[in-house]
Amino acid sequence: MFAYNHKTLHVCLRLISLRNCSNTWTFVPYANSNRGLNINQQLKLFNRRSKIALSSFIIPTSVDILVKVAGFQRYIVNVEFSNVQSYFRYYNYISLYFVTHSKVPLNRLPNSMIPYTVFAHFDIVPYTTYSILTKYRCAQDKEREIVGLINASQSKLRYKFCGLRN
């Protein structure tokens, strides 16, 4: 399927809001077989299974994300990434720092819209920070824009991230 010789790692991700910062979101691994574990336990389990892969995650240059909102329909999120600066730091997860330019801040979105289910392809781009512009339609069919940053560190693997299956 891929033209590159990189390995492909199948990982389920859930988009989680952090309590102390309503505009900060973190991708964390989630597997259906680990439903009895909390997020931290799942992350530790994932790290043990993927020691070679998890010097860091890698960042996409562009991606279409299918967002499944609990109690709502699914939305396609088109994300475009542009390199803004070099960033040298190791991560075992990806943090997205969102600044919304819509009339409704992220911290005022309905709780029923959290968590999101995300489907995405990620390609290797080591030691870089990306700015993203995300456009999506909310339940009221109003287009919103979110600008954010994604930080990446070095990785030698190609990942494929899959969303949750209920």
Swiss-Prot record:
It comes from the Eukaryota. This is Uncharacterized protein C24B11.14. It comes from Schizosaccharomyces pombe (strain 972 / ATCC 24843).
